[in-house]
């Protein structure tokens, strides 16, 4: 049913391909554009390039050996997320540029997102509960799960919107109760909550898709995808119908179950649960529609491939010009929905890009290029490298290759199954197979995928996948914290053997694209500073004190205080950058009553910052943003979830956050925690390990606006050593090199370099207000 091919060339009548996994004497012919069989892939076939990899699915072979597939999947090793693909199907059309548009739209109205998260929590409670859950207790759990999000939500500060929100929460709770207790048991539904799996993930190499379901029966006979928003109330008068993007999502899950898990779609009952009504809607499969959807997927992947291959500002600009109301409005809508809601959301991005200066546009396109190339390489591996790299190594690399690199632990047996613990579900696994010649490349806090592996053919592409993090690891045992609790012990059979591998997540890339969005909306003052269009400013009143400073650490602190925009501290290892210089700056800014944000690249470095903060006397109050498993146990009392635990109202959360003037975390964590900046504005950010942080990784934080419209971060201090530990980049130096003369003129020579390095090169003179180099020994 499935064949992996490499495209050689096309002609009017056929594609000519070679098998990837076998030897052929001559190219095979593939018939395409066949009405009612595969003509939906006409646009895909027009985009193919020499050596493009394609999967052919449901292939018929005629007497002449000509292949006629029902599905043509382009570059299947590049996995698209099912929900992201489904969201490209909008009321106004399904142009692939919707995928790029979504990247550049930071979530601003958090109320619908919050309601969705809380509804998911309600579903978990109703599935796990042996007796009837209490609504108020569930809302308390929701508050403990999302304290910052609830406290920062602007809509909830409006009395009427607040009333509506909590009325909606109660309505969704009651509707989920009705669905689970009544509809599940109704004739024809065949849903059994005692034999359910919550949040299983699937990786489907055949279709080039990945996704996570809300609810699945263990035997995969039926599944539920839950939606807290509105269905389509206008398509048919007096009738509620699923929205197209929701129908597409369900269709993709059905296809994944068929092509990854071997579950024929007509034997699976898929349901859309609209908790607003409630409506448990049986979704109807349409393989013709699926082909149209997969053609859109292919066009998105071709777009991504083209951007990373061309590596050209002009080409990227052309692709991004498709983000325009006239292009995306394929259905030529002209109604109120389009004019009032849809058009403005598209046009806002279009106009912001147009409003950039030529230099700013070049910078924007260069970073978009770079991020897209990094993402492509992280998914599919380097197209110029023969080894198995990137997320696709999960299914392309052999067991021997994975074992040699320490990238898999297998033959694991469950010794303790606490997956039903709804607060902190975990598994204790024993290593029954150890290879003394290789060291596992896993450590505490790592994100992993877990799956049953009882025979050599079992892998992430044909088994149900559970996501989690490593809580503890030793030579004999591994303790895994599961992302979702599983009340049903049969989901993870004791008699099975299991494997874990690294999880490859797009979160960091999503945050970098959000950083570009923040750049579009940044203050002109901050954009000019970052692009060297104005000089950094300083308070010259401290000149005398700086000249008379008793030692380097006093001088550093005074220079950091004098800087109005930024200050760079260059320090080789062992010079006391963290233990003395950073501490001295924190103490000085704290005495001045400043709001301080402390950042680093790694969690280990954040632990060191926490160690420094706890050594300050008198004691300072600080909050750490981050994961419990990535935090040293000594500093876990300072984690935000523990600090806010005594709070029972949004006002108490807001007051506790306002009282604390020092916040700590990794750049990656804070970049994804945008709601924090709706509650806090920081006078200064002190950023350690700055030479390990890529410019697009830091851009969003430096460009973000606070609630009043000014910069969310006032000035910033970058601490690092440009001669030590460069940032980790997947693409080669040649690929990340900047050719544009305008960008080279502001010191941007290569995007593998950090912002620290660029600003250091732009320093006015060796003895400057902008930076200071520590001597070799502290």
What annotation goes with each model-predicted range?
Residues 591, 602-604, 617, 654, ...:
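Conserved helicase motor core of SF1/SF2 NTP-dependent helicases
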Residues 13-18, 22-45, 55-56, 376-529:
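Conserved ASCE P-loop ATPase motor domains encompassing nucleic-acid-directed helicases/translocases
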Residues 1-5, 9-16, 116, 120, ...:
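A helicase ATPase "motif cassette" and its flanking acidic/Ser/Thr-rich regulatory loops
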Residues 17-49, 193-299:
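Mg2+/Mn2+-dependent nuclease catalytic core
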Residues 95-98, 273-279, 287-310, 439-558, ...:
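Pre-ATPase regulatory/linker segments immediately N-terminal to the P-loop/RecA-like helicase/translocase core
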Residues 598-611:
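Conserved Walker A/P-loop ATP-binding site and its immediately adjacent core
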Residues 122-198:
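A non-catalytic, helix-rich entry segment at domain boundaries
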Residues 3-11, 769-778:
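Conserved small/polar residues in nucleotide/adenosyl-binding loops
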